[in-house]
């Protein structure tokens, strides 16, 4: 208690906590922007990469394990990112969302570019022969090769979408 017996009023939260810094709209309006459309494409194409690599039975786990990790992780984080904007939580969480958007898309772009290169390298090993105890057989059969070609194409398209999102995020972060 103060000397006068009155309790000081609590601080105004609007003064204590600055408003979040975000230039993208929250709620369903995010889907009407280029960034929202790219995030939706990233989710769909990244899911296809994940499904295609998994359906090839991962014949080269050293190379394709990283591709699976990146595609699954990026898929779920992109869903979380889109969910935060669709639910409007970005307006209630004090953060520089423009900077976080840029950092997220930069990291995922770098990782997805590496995953694309590894998937392309795994696909290029189609004609490589593998010695077993009885016979010599190709490392990838024709079905696995076709699936890996499709996964490589979709990994490239997903990488391009993350690159476009990175460019848009850079423009928002540094106008």
From Swiss-Prot:
Topology feature Lumenal, residues: 55-65, 123-148
Signal peptide: none
Entry GO terms, CC: apical plasma membrane; membrane raft
Membrane spanning stretches: 34-54, 66-86, 102-122, 149-169
Membrane topology: Multi-pass membrane protein
Family matches, as PROSITE patterns: MARVEL
Coiled-coil zones: none
Glycosylation sites: 131
Cytoplasmic side: 1-33, 87-101, 170-175
Pfam families the record matches: MARVEL
Superkingdom, natural source: Eukaryota
Keywords: Cell membrane, Glycoprotein, Membrane, Transmembrane, Transmembrane helix
Residues of the MARVEL domain: 30-174
Subunit composition and interactions: Interacts with TPD52L2.
Stated family: Belongs to the MAL family.
Descriptive protein name: Protein MAL2
């Amino acid at each position: 208690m103060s000397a006068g017996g009155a309790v000081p009023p609590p601080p105004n939260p609007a003064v204590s906590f600055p408003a979040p810094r975000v230039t993208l709209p929250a709620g369903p309006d995010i889907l009407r922007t280029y960034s929202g459309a790219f995030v939706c494409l990233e989710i769909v194409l990244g899911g296809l990469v994940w499904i295609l690599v998994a359906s090839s039975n991962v014949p080269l786990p050293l190379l394709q394990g990283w591709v699976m990790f990146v595609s699954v992780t990026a898929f779920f984080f992109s869903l979380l990112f889109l969910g935060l904007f669709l639910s409007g939580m970005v307006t209630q969480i004090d953060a520089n969302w423009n900077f976080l958007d840029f950092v997220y898309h930069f990291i995922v772009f770098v990782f997805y570019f590496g995953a694309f290169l590894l998937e392309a390298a795994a696909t290029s090993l189609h004609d490589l022969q593998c010695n077993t105890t009885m016979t010599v057989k190709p490392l990838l059969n024709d079905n696995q090769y076709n699936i890996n070609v499709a996964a490589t194409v979709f990994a490239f398209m997903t990488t391009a979408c993350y690159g476009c999102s990175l460019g848009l995020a850079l423009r928002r972060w540094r106008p």
